[in-house]
Each structure stands twice: as structure tokens, then as C-alpha cells.
Amino acid sequence: MNEEMKMTQEREGRILEAAIDTWGSEMQIVVAIEEMSELTKALTKYIRADDAATISVSIREEMADVGIMLNQLSLIFGDTTEEEIRKLNRLRR
């Protein structure tokens, strides 16, 4: 991993930890639920919509929000690497 990427990840970690410290774990869990709901809504619109290009932008924005919140949830509940490996191994079968 290059030095710039490592610095970016460290900075992101500090930002995420600051958000948890400022608003608390419980509130960040609520925000994660809200962001996942917004992604669900955007995906549903994509399936039903005629203007897929516009909805695709919204989906990418919501995916970014959910990704950030998943990173915060990892800080709150712990790393999911082992679970992800198990799930990927099951998919491979």
C-alpha cells in the first residue's frame, strides 16, 4: 500500500471515530439504518424507473454513504474480515 493511501485511510479512521465520539454509537447505528434505507429506495426506483441514468447517480451516492456507515459499524462492532471470507467461500461452492 502506498504512503498516500495509508494516510488517507488513517485520516478516514480518525474522521469516523470522531463522528462516533461526537454523536455516540447508538445514533450512528440509526444513521446507518437510514442510509441503508435510502439505498434500498434508490435501488427500487432503478427497477421501476424509465430514467436509469439519473437513478444510477443516486445509487452511487447512496452506496458511498452506506460504505461510510459500514466502516463506522466496523469500528463499533468489530472487523468482519473472517465473516466475509466465510461468506465468499460459501459462494464459491
Language model regions located:
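Flexible "arm" and connector segments at domain edges
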Residues: 1-93
